[in-house]
Amino acid sequence: MIWHVQNENFILDSTRIFMKAFHLLLFHGSFIFPECILIFGLILLLMIDSTSDQKDIPWLYFISSTSLVMSITALLFRWREEPMISFSGNFQTNNFNEIFQFLILLCSTLCIPLSVEYIECTEMAITEFLLFVLTATLGGMFLCGANDSITIFVAPECFSLCSYLLSGYTKRDVRSNEATTKYLLMGGASSSILVHGFSWLYGSSGGEIELQEIVNGLINTQMYNSPGISIALIFITVGIGFKLSPAPFHQWTPDVYEGSPTPVVAFLSVTSKVAASAPATRIFDIPFYFSSNEWHLLLEILAILSMILGNLIAITQTSMKRMLAYSSIGQIGYVIIGIIVGDSNDGYASMITYMLFYISMNLGTFARIVLFGLRTGTDNIRDYAGLYTKDPFLALSSALCLLSLGGLPPLAGFFGKLHLFWCGWQAGLYFLVSIGLLTSVVSIYYYLKIIKLLMTGRKQEITPHVRNYRRSPLRSNNSIELSMIVCVIASTIPGISMNPIIAIAQDTLF
């Protein structure tokens, strides 16, 4: 009898939960339609994997890519609509958030072709890999639209948990296991620090969790200049710092880049920074509106340390992936300049434009690392010597992406940095921009050093890896080369038409 009553209560509770979820989707589903497409894609992947055999593997890639492209399309159709707040204030839809969601979807769409041949060669489980990538993308999209402290804490956990699993996907590799352990420990510590900072905001604002309501609560309680807000600022900056990985919160980055599967590194190198930048800009601008001088100073210190340490340490690296890890630390220093400038002087527009170019430059470089690693089994920088003699297309594509990362004209990276630094200069960040210019020159040195190795024709300098280099049949690598071509074009052509891109970003944001 007791069991029967408990069973009925369980059914009633489950029914209420289901009806509430159905009600939320019915009345708020249009606000998260791009996210719903990804959820539907995840369900399809699970259904096909559980009911089919190995012959249906191409369908898994097709469904993953199609769901991402359809999500991008839904996002573009919703462009320029009026800002909307849904799910009782937990989620906000506006042009600013949608731009970051578009960048995350673009990253994932370009990363899936990079993983096709790699997964086949390493015999990794395909379905789980695609599920983790799509779920991480979904978490990043929810993070971009988060409008309260709880969602800002929960959404990155969805992204982070999938990132931990992806970084340790090659479980037989000792380096991958070590990278996952460090990533998990550092990620868990940063999450606890972040939520502790939110607890200070919650208490100081009188129990508010929505970002704008936190500001109103701080005004009502007269706590906007209290020591508690300073403590919250420090903890939240540290928590977000571990997600963005600027110096000195970069300790996990080189090991994770070196030990994780290369397609995973390509995915994490761009999506993690885009996903963390969106809430960072909103948190600093809204709840800490009255502490702008303090957080400007904190971010300036982080930017300077990142640009100097990242680019100087990158010079000494012998592994291509570790070099790109330290390079990414320097790159986030440039992005922080745009966060500091903010709405004034087109800071956000220049930051978003540079992020768009950075995605193409970085993914193009990682596409080359994936191809070279599969054909030679190494990512040592010295082993790239003489690659031009064996594979001119791969060498030239790599050179263009590296030159664009260094910021040489007339490539996209040059114009992206130029506009970003110009916005910083107009905002009075003279010292910060000067450091950025100097460290950009330093980065050009180690990028040119790699290009020199790629183009060398001296037989005594060509390594055995390149001598034995054999191109795979075009059928097996066309997806990687297709992604590389797209990234190379995006790293070069937009530099010529920079003004229209900046104008579109400015017109969309403001």
Swiss-Prot record:
InterPro entries (alphabetical): NADH-Q_OxRdtase_suN/2, ND/Mrp_TM, Ndh2_N
One of the protein's GO biological processes: photosynthesis, light reaction
Signal found in the keyword field: no
Domain of life where this protein originates: Eukaryota
Subcellular localization: Plastid, Chloroplast thylakoid membrane
Catalytic activity: a plastoquinone + NADH + (n+1) H(+)(in) = a plastoquinol + NAD(+) + n H(+)(out); a plastoquinone + NADPH + (n+1) H(+)(in) = a plastoquinol + NADP(+) + n H(+)(out)
EC number: 7.1.1.-
Transmembrane segments: 24-44, 57-77, 99-119, 124-144, 150-170, 183-203, 229-249, 295-315, 323-343, 354-374, 395-415, 418-438, 484-504
One Pfam family named in its UniProt record: Ndh2_N
Swiss-Prot/TrEMBL keywords: Chloroplast, Membrane, NAD, NADP, Plastid, Plastoquinone, Quinone, Thylakoid, Translocase, Transmembrane, Transmembrane helix, Transport
Record GO terms (molecular function): NADH dehydrogenase (ubiquinone) activity; quinone binding
Keyword Magnesium applies: no
Membrane topology type: Multi-pass membrane protein
Major subcellular location class: plastid
GO cellular component: chloroplast thylakoid membrane
PANTHER family: NADH DEHYDROGENASE
Function: NDH shuttles electrons from NAD(P)H:plastoquinone, via FMN and iron-sulfur (Fe-S) centers, to quinones in the photosynthetic chain and possibly in a chloroplast respiratory chain. The immediate electron acceptor for the enzyme in this species is believed to be plastoquinone. Couples the redox reaction to proton translocation, and thus conserves the redox energy in a proton gradient.
Subunit structure: NDH is composed of at least 16 different subunits, 5 of which are encoded in the nucleus.
UniProt family annotation: Belongs to the complex I subunit 2 family.
NCBIfam families per the UniProt record, alphabetical: NDH_I_N (TIGR01770), PRK02504.1 (NF002701)
Protein known as: NAD(P)H-quinone oxidoreductase subunit 2 A, chloroplastic
Organism: Drimys granadensis
